[in-house]
C-alpha cells in the first residue's frame, strides 16, 4: 500500500495554487476579533507557503449564516487582520464560487494570497453540493 504524502514531503510548490481551508471561526463582534488564537496559529504555515512562492487560495467559514450575505459573519475583519500580520499581497474575493471562479482569480501571482469570503455564504457548501465541490476544487 502506498504511503500518503504529508504536505511537508512536497518540496516544490513554486507557482502552484494551494487551496488551504483554515479554521478562522473566531468570535467577532462589531468587526472586532475577540480571540485571535486560531488565526495566529495558522500564520506560520501560510507564511511558509508564501516563502515557497505558492499561490495561496485561503478559505474559511465564520458561524452559521442565516442568509447568503449575513455581513455580521463576514470574514472581512479577519482579512484586515491578516493584512496587518502577513507582509505579502492579500486579495479579498467577495463573490460566490462558480464554474468561472478560476478565471476570475487567474491574476493571482506567486507569493500572493486570495482570501475568499465566508465559504458558508455559498449555499452549496451547506448542502454538500457536488457541483459546488467541483467548482471549489477547480480553483486549485
What are these regions (language model features)?
Residues 1-140:
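Active-site loop-to-helix "anion-binding N-cap" substructures in soluble metabolic enzymes
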Amino acid at each position: 500500500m502506498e504511503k500518503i504524502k504529508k504536505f511537508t514531503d512536497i518540496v516544490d510548490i513554486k507557482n502552484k495554487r494551494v487551496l488551504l481551508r483554515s479554521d478562522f471561526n473566531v468570535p467577532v463582534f462589531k468587526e472586532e476579533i475577540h480571540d485571535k488564537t486560531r488565526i495566529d496559529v495558522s500564520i506560520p504555515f501560510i507564511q511558509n507557503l508564501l516563502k515557497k512562492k505558492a499561490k495561496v487560495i485561503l478559505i474559511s467559514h465564520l458561524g452559521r449564516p442565516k442568509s447568503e450575505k449575513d455581513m455580521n459573519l463576514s470574514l472581512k475583519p479577519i482579512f484586515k487582520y491578516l493584512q496587518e500580520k502577513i507582509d505579502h499581497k492579500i486579495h479579498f474575493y467577495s463573490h460566490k464560487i462558480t464554474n468561472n471562479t478560476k478565471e476570475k482569480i487567474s491574476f493571482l501571482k506567486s507569493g500572493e494570497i486570495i482570501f475568499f469570503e465566508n465559504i458558508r455564504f455559498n449555499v452549496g457548501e451547506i448542502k454538500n453540493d457536488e457541483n459546488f465541490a467541483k467548482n471549489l476544487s477547480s480553483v486549485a
